[in-house]
Swiss-Prot record:
Pfam families (UniProt xref): ITI_HC_C, VIT, VWA
Job description of the protein: May act as a carrier of hyaluronan in serum or as a binding protein between hyaluronan and other matrix protein, including those on cell surfaces in tissues to regulate the localization, synthesis and degradation of hyaluronan which are essential to cells undergoing biological processes.
GO molecular function: serine-type endopeptidase inhibitor activity
Stated name of the protein: Inter-alpha-trypsin inhibitor heavy chain H2
């Protein structure tokens, strides 16, 4: 993204080239002593005129040259954050108490990546407002006014991690001036939290100083923290109010608290107020927020095992790295190497005019190898030139060769991290040629990250290089903080959790989707995708996410209703109803700017340029193609906010640069062909549902068992009366390597002297696939070898590999598919949380077509061999509605009772009555042995048979 360095310096000089502001033409500011809380983007005395722009001078100074003569009456900042979209308004009111005219400067810092949306200045009742024009038009208007002596100077400059907005006005004695600046930015998640910074530098004591930060997050607030950034001076001043979905931070120091010391006349308010927070994430599918024709999809899954990584560090050791840069880089690398996981592989390439490698091949991150690599790095002595081309090609060769020779874990990710402080001086010098060489040689499973130290390096080149090869670039400032900056960046990419993440929105009425395909997802971050939809054609927006975790393929589905947010947004005055539109525009324009820098032909670049220009004008955003013209009502006095050539990529603060791909539906492996057994329950989305078969083997509450015996076409039922915590063997088939066990939970209290029990947890073990699956009433956990993946009942998702598929239907059911021929279905039974007795429990269903080995056993497994039964002598029972009969089975003659049991597959709330013959005494005589023979010690223990 183009960093807009817009510095407005307005010089209202009382000389020939400037216009004067008459002292007798101003009006009093109404409500001067009242700092009232207002709705987002609404402040007094200002014409609402939303526009975008940015600016950047080198330094920020005090509000005026004469501190004693000008009073800062109020300095007020308000930020409102709605679902990561922040709008900040800075308002300053000053009074000239001097008998002479005074220059007053409004100089504020805003975060890089922010868009200025409006600037308004009121001096002596004359109001200056802003409009967005195409850049050449804006410059022409500025030039016309300048020729008449009716403008100020036009200055463009850069700063470090902040951008400056600066304007100056000369006001007559007794005059009052008000400045107001609006800017917007998106909050990117880094290392597990969002960080909102407000730079406070009023330059003098303010009679009224007030900062309010309102945060509205629909997912709910997980934590909120305001670190001490003023060295304890304002301890206890910030007031934090944390709610479930809305929080407030206020900072209102009195004049006495603002003083640097008790008798000081200068302010201690000079720094950043920082607010850190994170949101709840109950659904692995992410949060899909849909409103007013736009949608935004936030995706930050947790509880996933890290994917092993193959990482090559490519370090510039040329002469320009001498001193503090090299020392800080070495210190950072030592810490980074210690943080590598044992399953990672790594090596180090260092280069000046020559290229060296610590190891010619990737090695495992053992303690011995890490210690040796740290010794190697400590001995580096910077000298010579910079051969970036050969260093990158060497690193690419090492990874390519390891991949071609099968030395890399197929489930791993490959990363190259380049650290350099300058442009090439040796070897290939042409940047476009280096970019082409890297693109031609790097495999499409490798991500290239570039860290540019200082300002001597061509940062725009590094960003093109990384964006084109599935990575990002970041500037590192060459100072004593270099080490922590390097370590912080590494921490952001140190934990890959998913590969090949793709967001699909298959509905035809969903359009203009931002980048929706990403090479990797890293823990602690967040992927954000936005788009448009036609509310007249859609009642809901469907999302399907496909991704790969450790040894597992994922398909995550969600549906979001159109009216879910309307009621909430309309009732909260601090919630921005346009947040979805603003987020979509922010992402789209920044991604287009990055695509423009990578455009392979002039024609493509012109097309992208045209799109950016139109969007910039439509959404009032100052980009490299537009400018902000600020003028009075007559239009004869103007100043210009322009954007100088500056670093740009997508998107400032983002960890991902993705691509756009066409949306697809659920992949074929996640939607097996419907069969009679597949119909045990609906899998995935509604369109995948099919009709359940009439006959399956199932276990529900009590727990009661319903066994369908196809030879006799009878349903046989029995209950098991055991204790909470006991684990029962349901299927134990060591020959096939299949196990199903269930752990009992009890009701909240006994009824009629009996405590009812239910299945609260089920364990499935597929030994040949080395896969264990634990399903509880809370979540679903897949353990595949050494990796663990968790899903929640709040997800609709598919997870699996070529042999095992887990399909979760939100809040209802889980289906396990083994080798596309064996099926296991689990239903979740929810009860009212405040029910005095009942608890949530699970039901399990097995189709009789599952093909176990002849040695299969367990309370359910033994009936897969379909024993013969004979029911005769049907007669009236003690209850006229429940007749009795005699049943011969396995050499036993039993008395059974005709009754009804519930089948919850088609009606999970009330169930469907199923007629069956009930066997008393915990199935004695119908099952082999006693039910206690089926107790096992662990959830994944096979049944030991005599």
């Amino acid at each position: 993204m183009q960093r807009l360095a817009c510095v407005l310096i307005w010089l209202f000089l009382l000389e020939e080239q400037a216009f004067e502001i008459p002292a007798n033409e101003y009006s009093e500011f109404a409500g001067y002593s009242n700092l009232v809380e207002l709705a987002p983007d609404k402040f007094p005395f200002v014409q609402e005129n939303r526009r975008y722009q940015r600016s950047l001078p080198e330094e920020s100074g005090e509000m005026t040259d004469n501190v004693d003569q000008v009073t800062l009456y109020s300095y007020k900042v308000q930020s409102t954050i709605t679902s990561r979209m922040a709008t900040t308004i800075i308002q300053s009111k000053l009074v000239n108490n001097s008998p002479q005219s005074q220059n007053v400067v409004f100089d504020v810092q805003i975060p890089k990546g922010a868009f200025i949306s409006n600037f308004t200045m009121t001096v002596n009742g004359i109001t200056f407002t802003s409009t967005i024009r195409e850049k050449t038009v804006g410059r022409a208007l500025y030039s016309q006014a300048r020729a008449k002596g009716k403008t100020a100077g036009w200055v463009r400059s850069r700063t470090l991690d902040m951008e400056n907005f600066n304007t100056e006005v000369n006001i007559p004695p007794g005059a009052k001036v008000q400045f107001e600046l609006h800017y917007q930015e998106m909050k990117w998640r880094k290392l597990g939290s969002y960080e909102h910074k407000i730079h406070l530098q009023p330059g003098r004591l303010a009679k009224h100083l007030e900062v309010n930060v309102w945060i509205v997050e629909l997912q709910g607030m997980r934590f909120l923290h305001v670190p001490d950034t003023f060295e304890g001076h304002f301890q206890g001043v910030p007031v934090i109010s944390k709610g479930q979905k809305k929080s407030h931070v206020s900072f209102k120091p009195t004049v006495a608290q603002q003083r640097k010391c008790p008798n000081c006349t200068y302010t201690a308010v000079d720094g950043e107020l920082v607010v850190m927070y994170d949101v709840n994430r109950e659904e692995k599918v992410g949060e899909l927020e849909v409103f007013n024709g736009y949608f935004v999809h936030f995706f930050a899954p947790e509880n996933l095992d890290p994917i092993p990584k193959n990482i090559l560090f490519v370090i510039d050791v040329s002469g320009s790295m001498w001193g503090i840069k090299m020392k800080q880089t070495v210190e950072a690398m030592k810490t980074i190497l210690d943080d590598l996981r044992t399953e990672d592989q790594f090596s180090v390439v260092d280069f000046n005019h020559n290229v060296r490698t610590w190891r010619n091949d990737l090695v495992s991150a053992t303690k011995t190898q890490i210690t040796d690599a740290k010794r190697y790095i400590e001995k580096i002595q910077p000298s010579g030139g910079t051969n970036i081309n050969e260093a990158l090609l060497r690193a690419i060769f090492i990874l390519n060769e390891a991949s071609n020779l099968g030395m890399l874990n197929p489930d791993s990710v490959s990363l190259i991290v380049l650290v350099s402080d300058g442009d090439p001086t040796v070897g290939e010098l042409k940047l476009s040629k280096i970019q082409k060489n890297v693109k031609q040689n790097i495999q499409d499973n490798i991500s290239l990250f570039s860290l540019g130290i200082g300002f001597d390096v061509d940062y725009d080149f590094l960003k093109r290089l990384s964006n084109e090869n599935r990575g990002i670039a970041q500037r590192i400032y060459g100072n004593r903080d270099t080490s922590s900056q390097l370590k912080k960046f590494y921490n952001q990419v140190s934990t890959p959790l998913l590969r090949n993440v793709q967001f699909n929105y298959p509905q035809a009425s969903v359009t203009d989707v931002t980048q929706n395909s990403f090479h990797n997802y890293f823990g602690g971050s967040e992927i954000v995708v936005a788009g448009k939809y036609d509310p007249s054609k859609l009642a809901e927006v469907q999302s399907i996410i496909t991704a790969t975790s450790t040894n597992t393929e994922l398909v995550l589905e969600t549906l979001s209703q159109m009216d879910d947010l309307e009621d909430f947004l309309s009732k909260d005055k601090h919630a921005d109803p346009n947040f979805t539109k603003k987020l979509w525009a922010y992402l789209t324009i920044n991604q287009l700017l990055a695509e423009r820098s990578l455009a392979p032909t002039a024609a493509i670049k012109r097309k992208i340029t045209k799109t950016i220009l139109q969007m910039s004008l439509d959404h009032h955003i100052v980009t490299p193609l537009t400018a902000m013209v600020i003028e009075n009502e007559a239009g004869d006095e103007r100043m210009l906010a322009d954007s100088p050539p500056q670093d740009h990529s997508c998107c400032s603060g983002a960890l991902y640069y993705g691509t756009k791909v066409a949306s697809a539906s659920i992949p074929s492996w996640a939607s097996p062909s419907p069969t009679p057994v597949m119909a045990m329950l609906a899998v995935g989305a509604n369109r995948l549902e099919s009709t359940p078969p009439p006959h399956v083997i199932r276990v529900e509450n009590d727990p009661h068992f319903i066994i369908y015996l196809p030879k006799s076409q009878k349903n046989i039922c029995f209950n098991i009366d055991s204790e909470p915590g006991k684990i029962l063997s349901l299927v134990s088939d060591p020959e096939s390597g299949i196990l199903v066990n269930g752990q009992l939970i009890g009701a909240k209290k006994a009824e009629n002297g009996k405590l009812r029990t239910y299945f609260g947890k089920l364990g499935f073990y597929f030994q040949k696939e080395d896969m264990k699956i634990e399903i509880s009433t809370e979540n679903i956990t897949l353990i595949n070898g050494s990796s663990t993946t968790s899903l929640f009942w709040s997800d609709t998702a598919h997870l699996g590999n070529q042999r095992v598929l887990i399909s979760v239907k939100k809040g209802k059911s889980v289906t396990l598919t083994l080798n596309k021929e064996m099926f296991f279905s689990v239903l979740l039974h929810h009860v009212w949380k405040k029910h005095p007795v009942n608890v949530d429990f699970l039901g399990i269903y097995l189709p009789p077509t599952n093909k176990f080995s002849p040695s299969a056993h367990g309370l359910l497994g033994q009936f897969m061999n379909k024993p013969n039964i004979h029911i005769f002598n049907e007669r009236p029972g003690k209850d006229p509605e429940k007749p009795e009969a005699s049943m011969e089975v396995k050499g036993h003659k039993l008395t059974v009772t005709r009754g009804l049991q519930k089948d919850y597959r088609t009606d999970i709330a009330f169930g469907t009555d199923v007629p069956c013959w009930f066997v008393h005494n915990s199935g004695k005589g119908f099952i082999d042995g006693h039910y206690k023979d089926y107790l096992v010690p662990q959830l994944y223990s096979f049944l030991k048979r005599p």
